[in-house]
Amino acid sequence: MPRMLAESIRKTGHNPVFLTDNKTEGIEGCETYRFGFTGENVVWKRMLCYAEYNQEGIYLDSDMMVMKNLEPIMALDFDVALTKVSHQIIDPKGVNLTALMPYNGGFIAVKDKTFLPAMVRHVIDTQNEADVDLTQYWYCDQMTLAEVAGTRNLVELPVKIYNKTVKKPGMDVSGAWVLHFKGRGKEVMESYQ
C-alpha cells in the first residue's frame, strides 16, 4: 500500500516522504525517515512519528491514493486542515461517534509546527488525568484531533473530496482528490491506480 500511495503522489508532481519504523522495507526512490517507536498501537506510533518528523505538509495514511495535485490546499490560510466527516456514525451502543471524532486522522495538513507535538502532549495529559492508557485506543488520534485543532486556525475540508472512502471496484471517484481504502477497501486499491 505505501508504494501505491507514493506512486500516486509522484504522478501529481511531488516527491513523497515515507515515515516508518525501523523494520519496514523502504520505498525505492522515496525519501524515508525511520523512527524507533515500539508498541502495538499503530495509531499511537503514527502520532509519535508525525510529531517527531514535524514538517509543514500533508500527512496521509498509507492506505490512501492521491488523485489530484494537493498544492491548492497548502495555499490556504490555516494552521491545520482536516477532513470533516459529513455523516453520522453511531456505534452499537447508540453513541454518536461523529460528535466525538468529527475528523478523520487519515488526512492531516499542517503549517503550524506546534500542532503535531501538541496532539501527543494532549494524549499524555488526558491519560494522566483520567488514569487510562489512551495510547492503546485505536481512535486516540481522532479523539485528540477535535480537541487540539479547535484551538488553532482550522480549515475543514469535505471528506467526500479529500478523504473519500472506497470499498469496491468501479466506484465513481471523479470528484475526489484523495481516496481512502479503509478496512476491506484495501483489497481494491490496486484497481484505482
Task: Identify the function of each model-found stretch.
Residues 95-109, 137:
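A recurrent flexible, glycine/aromatic-enriched loop bordering the glycosyltransferase active site
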Residues 9, 16, 50, 63, ...:
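A residue-level signal for conserved active-site and pocket-lining positions in enzyme catalytic cores
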Residues 26-92, 109-113:
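GT-A fold catalytic core of metal-dependent nucleotide-sugar glycosyltransferases
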Residues 3, 7, 44, 48, ...:
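A structural signal for well-ordered alpha-helical segments within the folded catalytic domains
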Residues 13-22, 58-63, 80-82, 156-158, ...:
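Short, hydrophobic beta-strand segments that form beta-sheet elements in well-ordered domains
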